[in-house]
Amino acid sequence: MSGMVDLKEFLAELGKTQKELKNVIEQAKDIGLELKTNSKMTPEQAGKLYKYIVDGIKEQIQANQPAKNPEQDNKDDLNTAVASKSLNKKVSKTPKKEETKSQPKPKKTKEKKKEAPTPIAKKKGGIEIVNTFENQTPPTENTPKVVSHSQIEKAKQKLQEIQKSREALNKLTQSNANNASNANNAKKEISEVKKQEQEIKRHENIKRRTGFRVIKRNDEVENESENSVTESKKPTQSAAAIFEDIKKEWQEKDKQEAKKAKKPSKPKATPTAKNNKSHKIDFSDARDFKGNDIYDDETDEILLFDLHEQDNFNKEEEEKEIRQNINDRVRVQRKNPWMNESGIKRQSKKKRAFRNDNSQKVIQSTTAIPEEVRVYEFAQKANLNLADVIKTLFNLGLMVTKNDFLDKDSIEILAEEFHLEISVQNTLEEFEVEEVLEGVKKERPPVVTIMGHVDHGKTSLLDKIRDKRVAHTEAGGITQHIGAYMVEKNDKWVSFIDTPGHEAFSQMRNRGAQVTDIAVIVIAADDGVKQQTIEALEHAKAANVPVIFAMNKMDKPNVNPDKLKAECAELGYNPVDWGGEHEFIPVSAKTGDGIDNLLETILIQAGIMELKAIEEGSARAVVLEGSVEKGRGAVATVIVQSGTLSVGDSFFAETAFGKVRTMTDDQGKSIQNLKPSMVALITGLSEVPPAGSVLIGVENDSIARLQAQKRATYLRQKALSKSTKVSFDELSEMVANKELKNIPVVIKADTQGSLEAIKNSLLELNNEEVAIQVIHSGVGGITENDLSLVSSSEHAVILGFNIRPTGNVKNKAKEYNVSIKTYTVIYALIEEMRSLLLGLMSPIIEEEHTGQAEVRETFNIPKVGTIAGCVVSDGVIARGIKARLIRDGVVIHTGEILSLKRFKDDVKEVSKGYECGIMLDNYNEIKVGDVFETYKEIHKKRTL
């Protein structure tokens, strides 16, 4: 009965309760073992079931292997000894084959000569094995199993029984040949035990790890030679001696580890302690840990700590302490800006990380702030309190809300106040669409901008180049729109941009200079350098483009080109023939002289510059001009910088978006594709795009609409912010200037560029007394909505440029009593508005000295007043004129002369040297020696 394993004992070994009995029976069925509540198993069956439950290794039990009877022969104790090792799942199932002595066996066909039985040394102790290894492969049947201390202890007891059984086996073999098979089985079991011991030895060379170490009380003794026939028991070493050896061994190993040896060398110890090695137990293997729980009550183990990794633990503690110290330093307290004392109790409870008396000393890294940022966004990005930011701006004289935008100056002031390092970034870069330009750069035509002073013949010169007449069709003979044209010369194309020369079109000239490759400055030889000429040169210099001078009107008599060159040389533009680097080409727009020379110079300069661009991919263009045309809607003149713009492409330009419907060149011909440096008029826009905006082609309408909406929202919020944000100075000025006279106007123009020029010119007329208030401006005709905007305002005017109101609009204007003024020349519009502002302004009052009289005597007349007897010392004293009464050089009174008499007669005036009587209006405090000084006021009109 001692050889069978009871199911209840099996559960106890597993550490399971009776409630889990059903699960164990079910798992036994999976490997072909039928069990009941009171069943018993052979050790081999128990070992396989144990491995299946704990390790998940499924080994089927053959059906022809019946459970053994408890009343079996005592020889089964040999199997019990080995099965007890299998029960602990730690022994390898692939032992080596062992040679045995050959004996006559009737049931075996292949037999080998059996050698003398190998003596098995008794184990002195368990060997601790590492559960997991680095870079270990999953366990297989060839992987040695791990044997614990208690398992080896039990195995030793069984080995003693095996020795006794072997002696009995020899006797039984001699007496009864029928028991040969049983003896053979016993020998096999003995060989299995020997192989188990060999597998245990294989783990002795495992590298030691840092962590926990388990020291065993017993030691293992090497087996004697396998060829020895006799068996001898080795004497057991005492526990004190084992611990002494372990202590010496670990002292030596720790010394070696202190030298940072890669592998600890084997310590030289007594033979009993040579193979005693301890290894790190890895608790990450929950399966093995669970399997060893049943041996927790063993008392023959000592758990020691390996402090090899103590330095790592100390390092983590130091890092944690450093982080805590940093947090303590950053934790600051709010500073009260209104008093030197600390805050009141209520405020002191609010411990915010950014508030501290030393908060301004905290060094912060550079913070990226958008160029257009709201107050609350600035606070978030700078990690500041919103209330502190608003309060700081308030103390600086700026009243803002959290949604107001901050300008660049305000951002810099806040950064200085809070001791921040910031970098201001362009907000519009967030809206930029990433353009992927891949392809080969090809040669493109040069873009030439014609600039110069008004009436110097720019458009006439371009007309001569194009063999067209444009100048005569423009009102007043001056260019008021930006034009773009393509000209072919020597099989090469040149794109020309014609800019206005009037002072009101400064921004147009700037846009033309930004997109150009070469600037041609037209100067009239009979007029010389003018203000707009200098401005055009500044635009070209800012754009860093080469300049070619065209001396126009050379057909006129008495022209002096050397004088013109001298004026340009004073500005730093020296001619080539004077040793400089700038070409001065004499031309005549009237006769055409010098035109070919000018074009050749342009092409030579373009060849030197090697102008190239990528033609493949989405287009990127610049809007030169935008307008609204009847029947076509919003249109725009664009020049392509890179890529190709085709009919049907989706695009966006600032707040405008759409799909290209048609493209028309300067000759009025329809084209399908627009390559770099080419210009065309496109249709299909949702609205008129701002002049100078960048047009970008995208994949579809959805992307174009989304990008345009983002920009529209941003610009709208920015405009609202500017309308609400006001400083103390502006507020006080508004209160003081409540009598400010202004003229509300609505401006409508035919193109975006003209509208922009008119607005800028009118705003320059504003001064401290009168101002033009632009209520609304737009491109297109005058509508009823425009009338309703100004109907409630006094002195409101609607200004139209190159447009005419319809009959319905005229009738509504009469009904609303609104004045509509239309112009075709920008000169007339600006001059009339200047005159209108001058009429609202108070005149300039000047004084003119007329005479002076000295008081010699005074006469008090009852019910009349005091009459001063005077002698006129200078000029003429007239009745009704204004006079000052001066006493000791101080003006005592200012009033009018009510009565002037010569003796008893009333007179209008008294000349120098004559006596007269003077009585002032409502003033009688006149004394002898006072002086009357008379003057008259002269009103003069103001000028703007």
UniProtKB/Swiss-Prot annotation:
GO biological process, alphabetically ordered: translational initiation
Residues in tr-type G domain copies: 443-612
One Gene Ontology cellular component annotation held by this UniProt entry: cytoplasm
Biased composition (Polar residues): 132-150
Low complexity bias spans: 175-185
Region (G2): 477-481
G1, as annotated region: 452-459
Coiled-coil parts of chain: none
Keyword GTP-binding applies: yes
Biased composition regions of type Basic residues, renumbered to the chain: 204-215
Region feature G3, mapped onto this chain: 498-501
SUPFAM superfamilies named in the record: Initiation factor IF2/eIF5b, domain 3 (SSF52156), P-loop containing nucleoside triphosphate hydrolases (SSF52540), Translation proteins (SSF50447)
GO MF entries: GTP binding; GTPase activity; translation initiation factor activity
Function of the molecule: One of the essential components for the initiation of protein synthesis. Protects formylmethionyl-tRNA from spontaneous hydrolysis and promotes its binding to the 30S ribosomal subunits. Also involved in the hydrolysis of GTP during the formation of the 70S ribosomal complex.
Name used for this protein in its record: Translation initiation factor IF-2
Organism for this UniProt entry: Helicobacter pylori (strain ATCC 700392 / 26695) (Campylobacter pylori)
